Amino acid sequence: MKLKEDASTEKLRGGYYTPLSLAKFIVNWGVTNQVSSILEPSCGDGAFLEALKKSSGNFECTAVEVLDSEAEKSEMLVQNDLRFKVINNDFYDEYKNHLSDKTFDLVIGNPPYIRYQYLTEEQREEQSLIMTSNGLAANKLINAWVSFVVASVQLLSGNGKVGLVIPAELLQVKYAEKLRMYLMTHLQKITIVTFRELVFPDVQQEVVILMGEKDTFHEGVHQIKILEFDNIDDLNSNFHPVEERVAFKDIDMSTTKWTRYFLSKEQNALINKIKNDRRFVPFVEIGEVDIGITTGNNNFFSVNKDTVEDYDLGDVTLPLIARSVNIPGITFNEPDWIQNVEAGAKTYLLDFNNVSEAEMTVGQKKYIAEGEEREEHTGYKCSIRNKWYCVPSIWSPDAFFLRRNHLYPKFVLNNVPEAVSTDTMHRIRFPMFTDR
């Protein structure tokens, strides 16, 4: 994890700018004759404004940007076009003081992806205000994009539309569960566009497009559909035929899981049939599944053989599987680990939990001290520990579950005593006396 002072401007602002072709798609979808007011809450260098400028619509657009240089670029893009007003300010501050009592027919943009620890104290308070005022809990796991989405939906007019480029985490992570329920409740129709290829390859961040429609006078069930395309070109070329072919599905308000909406009616029927078949059992009846070890700084806590020898770390290390490529088969055995060690891979995890400072060797103390000199301990996870170098929840599992493993997930039996993994994979513990 980078320190705040060392993090890039993109990370601190959370800005990885939207390709113009994608901005044009969202604008073309969102702008209609009924749209008279538009909000762009984080306009960056103005991709959405450039797309909007080419529209002949009679609207007023309010655009907000926190960085002076980017706000200036956006201002230059729309100069002399009286439909636009660019505000150089933090959206949180603008929301609190000027926007919270307004509504817009269309909200579009690419909200910033900023982790909680990169927010200022004032931003954290304002983010919390957005969440709690909309009936959602605020916590330290919530990324800035979540609060931007909530605010965007809140600011919609009675028949407003929202079109946002957001992380695919919306579909996957636990901390987005409440957000999914919020969207299901407040939007009458939701279309999610996913991509097989990366839209932002430089940051390896999967994104989706949230296209939501509000209808205050709507009665009946809310609906959702999920569409998949190869890339932006495929989206622009084939959106309408794909969109017409995929029907909306009624939203089940009793669950926040959206997996079923990816599947066809026949596929969902098959899954329900399997659930009711006594030959199958839920995995929870077989074993306990937990995320791998979250070190807070894999670069510091995961080391290779040379580092172990240089700093006398042998007594405070455990065998480590750091990456899925370190496990070629469906079992992890001693020869596999030794092969990884000899290949120079980071195959040791540091565990200082069972050694006091007085018991540490000179080399071990030196390794920690050099880490502190490099400020390895200032990341969020490390900084909240009593002893930053003592990683919690270290235990060796019976098996590993590799959820992101090339073409398919993989279940690997662990035959190496004390072997552990980082949070790149899940770990599984069987009940006592289970015949593995």
How does the language model describe each region?
Residues S36, D105, D398:
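Conserved acidic residues
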Residues M1-A7:
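N-terminal, positively charged/glycine-rich alpha-helical extensions of SAM-dependent methyltransferases
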Residues Q267-R436:
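Polybasic, glycine- and aromatic-enriched phosphate-binding surface used to engage nucleic acids
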Residues S55, L77-V78:
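Alpha-helical interaction/dimerization surfaces of two-component signaling modules
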Residues K11-L12, Y17-F25, S42-L52, S56-E60, ...:
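Signature of N6-adenine DNA methyltransferases within the class I
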Residues V35-S42:
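Conserved class I S-adenosyl-L-methionine
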Residues N28-N33:
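Glycine-rich helix-loop-beta junction characteristic of Rossmann-like nucleotide cofactor-binding loops
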Residues A7-L12, S133-G135, S421-P431:
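Glycine- and acidic
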